[in-house]
């Protein structure tokens, strides 16, 4: 076949490895590597780089979590370790992403609990972990220090650095050997700026995963989709400050009107559809990690990613 | 007491022995550069002592000078005490130009081709042999003196009425004045005797806030007088939009009268200073923004500020000056610069003319900065222009201790990159009261170099230093301690100030980049950047580039043109041949509406970073910042 | 490749004669570069230049229209590979499949459902587009009967999926006047299929084992007089569909393989992952998508995704300015000001609803610009706020005089207070923090 895709790209997305096994000084049962693409997502025979991965999201304070998930999980949602064990065992995501939502309550001061929660999750699953800390500059330095310390050696991916508050999280990542999610509000320039800021305070590019912020389907998703495409093409054109893998999570998917108001009998199906129809496009736009909250989304999403990844004859 | 004589002007002053030369200069009313405030740190107050007894520590301050300079008597004025009579040469670099409103004695040379001629005539009285009428006699006289053909000169009734008396009372020795207007030659005055040397014109910059007037001698082109003054329309609204609103509510007449009044006042002041009669001003050339010139001509500007934003007139306008209420010679001409759109007015056309960019093959970028900014990109074949709002930050507005370029404003500042100690210079060398635009640009660049702010303008509060503190709401940096200021409190720059400045500079840079993109031009292809506007002359080119206010080009390609509007008006006044060229310029310009340009917002966010998100656009700045970071070590 | 304004300008006569309706040749060049005028509008271009300009400004993907009447739709006319480069112009048509093995009643039920299904979002009607009739039986009669069943219920655009020319002809005999898409010509029977397409004036889908063969076939079909082609890239492999559709789009817009400058047809059934295939089809260059009937959840998500992707990224969707209520606010409820950029509106509305605070949203007209942009562009100003308060009679709605403005509008707070006399509270920058903000500040 002579007519094929035109791949005259010169750049390459950097690779990032998350998690550490015993051999690397951690306790994970395996590690995952993302990035490395030299073309658009899924393009090429075989595609370049690494297959996009699925992270399953959970939290330590379910009162701020979408209702359809809590309904689906029942009691399991009250214990993050149990939650993680269940999701990892039954649904087989590639990573677990824990939100320390407890830190977002007003007047939070239970810093010791952070250490315990992180340790418990580390024990509950052997999957590589993503940990989301506080989003209050007042708490950040203590929270991220705790996370960093509790997960020392595990090569966690921790979030979320923003242009307004990136120093504490970067400091923790540098001190304890972790990776950082750098989030900017749906804008390629802002994404790049944050990466430069992080580089300038000493966090190397291979420790950064870009989160371009993802709007829910129907609520600005198209902006995120295009920003991801732009970031990816910029990287392929050789812009080193944008050549990091991306993580995408449409965190509002399960609270949008369409899902909230869905008929109870269709609640799960609607939840899955809303997550699938945002996260599969995110992988096509170039995201290396896509995140879901409804356990039932994992299987169809995984099947779709595999079908997109495998050239015919390459096995599914 | 010793006497200090300043060369080259021989200005003298007496003061007690032991005083510094700097003090002597201040006493003599000479404004010297004292960037470091007279601490002997900046080396900007260089003088050469030519003779007399004085004391200066050559060992300590020798590093500022070359051996040749020391040989020639170089000293730092602030560190040299006078012990007896001395003669001191102040090199031009050490003198601060007068601040206030920018009045620039034009640098551009042009041929002298005014549109006004005066003819001193000795006519023979009529007789029975020679009974031709007075007017014919006069016009014949003009023709014989080398003027236009008798048949080509139009004489208005008011002038004709005066002819018989003036001719006879003067014993047939008169001076006739002829002006070339678009319709042809026009006899505008007849006077007794020979008044040919009294031939003047006025160039006017009609700005929204200020008005500047130059009176020029049209015989030799020399400057007779200069005056400036606030636009009295300010009483009807601070900014341009409120003026239009005022005009809409039936206030057009009043605004027109105020515009004329403001110009008249400035003309009168300049004429009085020069000791000339306003009636001898035969032509007035006005450059102003589109709304201002519409108002001056009494044309309703209301439709310009609503979609689709069309001005009533685009091409140049002429009329008798008296019809606009200008108090100059009764029949004198008035010439109004053409405009491109409501946003690109005659002031910008004047900028373009003054810069000379419309005559060059190389591509130039012209930037006029005020609360609103205009940018023009192009050469003699094509031009793109756009306009937008930069916000008042760069003029000192919306910045906590920002101020206009008045006495007491810090207009230049540098930081010691180790100790963060500022060295600054204020306008008129009084104690600092605030910081003006050029000072803010310096400050931003220095804060960045010192790694006190990151590229988004956030102050790094992790640095422990007395000048960096958390402030009431946001972090701030102390520029001057209470004791050293003229306002009794610390002068600071807050993180919000820095952000406002970044947003302002970003809109300007984004506008430049949008035009460049539209034309497909890279930084390297820009042969010249012209800077016009209030602070254009005082701004540090390096720092303007460091913060990304303008695209990076080698600094020698940057030319401040000061007040381009008044310069352009002067050029047209002195050389009438430029008039036709103005319409040509105006026609060549393609106006780009930034709000309709989808890439503008992208350029804007890209520019909200110091200097820009695409670091490769500012290679030397990057190199410099890299060094600064290395020196400080990674925090 | 697209030419820049200045490149075009260099080719123009530079007479500035205004005959094209533009003030200068340069403005004409700018408009030509952005496709707002045609080269023909300037009478002074020589043939050569017109050719160059025409070739570089004509859309590289052929426009093709399916169906007639109200529900007909056009695809193609695309000019970019990524939507952020400009926009995608024509949404793919989603064609629900029925087979001629189904009994007419079931067919009609499907058709009626497609006809009536409607989702209204942001003031726009989102619909499925048409029916693909699949010849599973191979019998011309059965096919004709199925097509008749479809026709009996609704005038919807159709795809007639029958590769046997005889079967195809039977279907066309029923609905050939209504511009169905003929599916599909192959190397073996393209002459007959082309003849049918010419006879009925219908667009024709073509299918070949690989892209080279497809380009060849496309040439053969145009030689037969069919210029409204659609390229069938269906494959059991999702990976292949994505790769081939990407290749076709790249080749078309770079004009390296003009024979591939046609819209793409994808049948999502063979790959066994209907949702995934539809998603890829919407994202990556499908123009006609065939699918089995979907669950309501998938259907909604699909229509919304398609709307999202085909929204012009340069023209934000706007909300009509005015007062909007969240819950049932009373005279003490907070008034939150924001801009009429739809995303901003929906985001704030979502969080306000979630916060459970009854409130008023005052939406002012910033021409669809976001808060940050409209502040920067001077579109959001104190006078606009003042006029909007008045226009929407906000003082009559509430007893208090406090206005909550978005965090990014903070620089305007003083001016708004001066201009309106209202007290201004600067809200959070991120709508997600609104609940917390209200809890703290609004008691
Ligand atoms: S018609 Fe042609 S020559 Fe005349 S102005 Fe338009 S582009 Fe220029
Ligand atoms: S060295 Fe004299 S003023 Fe700075």
Report each predicted region and the residues it spans.
Chain A
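N-terminal amphipathic alpha-helix/helix-capping segment at the start of soluble metabolic enzymes
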Residues: 1-74
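Glycine-rich, proline-tolerant flexible connector loops at the mouths of alpha/beta enzymes
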Residues: 63-72, 93-125, 131-138, 300-301
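Catalytic domains of carbohydrate-active enzymes, especially glycoside hydrolases
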Residues: 78-101
